[in-house]
Amino acid sequence: MPRDYQAEKEKCKTFLQEFYKDDEFGKKNFKYGVQLANIAHREQVALCIDLDDLAEEDPELVDAICENTRRYTNLFADAVQELLPQYKEREVVHKDALDVYIEHRLMMEQRGRDPNEMRDPHNQYPPELMRRFELYFKAPSSSKARVVRDVKADSIGKLVTVRGIVTRVTEVKPMMVVATYTCDQCGAETYQPIQSPTFMPLIMCPSRECQTNRSGGRLYLQTRGSKFIKFQELKIQEHSDQVPVGNIPRCMSVYVRGENTRLAQPGDHVGITGVFLPMLRTGFRQVVQGLLSETYLESHRLVKMNKTEDDELGTEELSEEELRQITEEDFYEKLAASIAPEIYGHEDVKKALLLLLVGGVDHSPRGMKIRGNINVCLMGDPGVAKSQLLSYIDRLAPRSQYTTGRGSSGVGLTAAVMKDPVTGEMTLEGGALVLADQGVCCIDEFDKMMDSDRTAIHEVMEQQTISIAKAGIMTTLNARCSILAAANPAYGRYNPKKTVEQNIQLPAALLSRFDLLWLIQDKPDRDNDLRLAQHITYVHQHSKQPPSQFQPMDMKLMRRYITMCKSKQPAIPESLADYLTAAYVEMRKEARTNKDMTFTSARTLLSILRLSTALARLRLEDVVEKEDVNEAMRLTEMSKDSLQGDKGHASRTQRPADVIFSTIREMVPEKGARSVKYSEAEQRCVSKGFTPAQFEAALEEYEELNVWLVNQARTKITFV
């Protein structure tokens, strides 16, 4: 059906001038009028037209735009250009080179030209040169996002929305939009608008003077008078859940211009609205590959998406009601239990994973970097849901990568040198650890990795960087990610007759870099096995966790709360410094006396500091409190106890009351009063992993034996 494009342009003008929405006070808010005024005064560059707004006025025009987007982009741009003088109230203060150039040319033209003379079509100013704004369309909400493999020939020239993962991002480079030439004979200027990625420069001057005199003037490109725009190429790949059986994921090239550049990084899940266009091959490739043409998506709008849902990544702040719901009583336990609620038990492991997601605070004193990210290793028997926990964290973390030990090489984890298909230069392609920058990298089957590949992780886990010296490229890449590793013991199952080192068989240099190392054992216990079996059968039948008084939090809400927590930068007050140093010295002393199998070093103290700041972040506080330090020490002790759970019969037969007694006895000063403060004794025992109830029971038991006395106010324990 033929369309009158002049009438369509008038419709566009009317829409831009007259469209309004009522605000909360009932006043008319002219959405596009305000933006046009900003563009006229150079306060805004991009004008994004929401097709949902246009659908309220003219649904037919929306259909036409979706079918023939390139033509209507130019129509809308012409309409905006004609409307701008009406909205311009003052002169632009800061003028760039192109402004001055165009002003000079217009003044010269008005002086030297007869008013009745027609303008030569070859050297009249193209509209692209005069436009100082960019125009984009936002797809209507009724249009559904497509998979990469569903965008086919019927979508050519149409506005489509595609979802995928960004795999490659080129550098932003200037792309020529209008080429300006000067003739060496007559001095006339010629303009060449460029629509495609490649163009053939003009050589001979087309002006009337050169053609009349047959002087054969040659044209020279003037870069200062030409117009350039920012250009970037992305490669997106479809999601693994969208790939049919037996196929490999498809890729698509996306050309991004102007204000849409630098919005995505490799590894981001994005939704891109754009025009699907063909591009004929050029040069040598055209000769070799004949009539084949490539396709690409010319981007109009790029937004980051959530991984698991089809909605955009939530960046809005949490409301007061949502904050109140999260930060109610026992919110720490509630948040931890909301991590993988289908998995039974593992309360302390889930707390550690919650702190890993939140992370500690980075410090950079005088160029030396102290990491804030928390690294956790889950070691355990087969079938204790290690991989399930990893995959849940991969889904929950706003930015993450999931790899397995055997499927990852050292290059795949760090970086590879590749040849850029666009420019032909040697470039670096980031691996899993680089793609997980500012996020979490989950590595399953950590024990199956080759030793040569595993050494690539050492630098990342402490310095948070990757140093590369390959193919003449010397650089350092950022890899500020937390590492969550899952591994099986050396003999498949944990062998209690062997030492911890023989069971784990990972180098001490690597183990000391993990803040928490959990050993999850599958021990037979009738009551526990019964509850676990009931839980598993219920989940299998109903595909959800069993009903309980506790209601797990929504994944989207948790993701937004974790992002909010990361904005806090809590500090450790001076009042806690002595307490921390005393606690660390005590841990070193215990490691010496107990012949501890785990390695207690200065990194252990840094781990406690990281866990403490993560707990303070979780409470949205700016200062670390004593309870945070105690909880961090408790988690550290529990992770060590998990490693020593089967260390001979002595540790199994020792009752909690006996351990509490020996702990309190060690606190008694050698000289002076043989008494201990009740609160300090309780804190010491709780930090070692005992509950307040066990502490009370031990006090009563030894009080009946007349070993010590507790005063009535319960503030002091005195040895008899």
UniProtKB/Swiss-Prot annotation:
Which enzyme class, named as a word?
Answer: hydrolase
C4-type zinc finger positions in the chain?
A: 183-210
Task: Reply yes or no: does the keyword Nucleotide-binding apply.
Answer: yes
One Gene Ontology cellular component = nucleus
Q: Where in the cell is it found?
A: Nucleus; Chromosome
Miscellaneous comment as given in the Swiss-Prot or TrEMBL entry:
Early fractionation of eukaryotic MCM proteins yielded a variety of dimeric, trimeric and tetrameric complexes with unclear biological significance. Specifically a MCM467 subcomplex is shown to have in vitro helicase activity which is inhibited by the MCM2 subunit. The MCM2-7 hexamer is the proposed physiological active complex.
So what does this one do?
A: Acts as a component of the mcm2-7 complex (mcm complex) which is the putative replicative helicase essential for 'once per cell cycle' DNA replication initiation and elongation in eukaryotic cells. The active ATPase sites in the mcm2-7 ring are formed through the interaction surfaces of two neighboring subunits such that a critical structure of a conserved arginine finger motif is provided in trans relative to the ATP-binding site of the Walker A box of the adjacent subunit. The six ATPase active sites, however, are likely to contribute differentially to the complex helicase activity.
Q: What is this protein called?
A: DNA replication licensing factor mcm7-B
Q: What is the lineage of its organism?
A: Eukaryota, Metazoa, Chordata, Craniata, Vertebrata
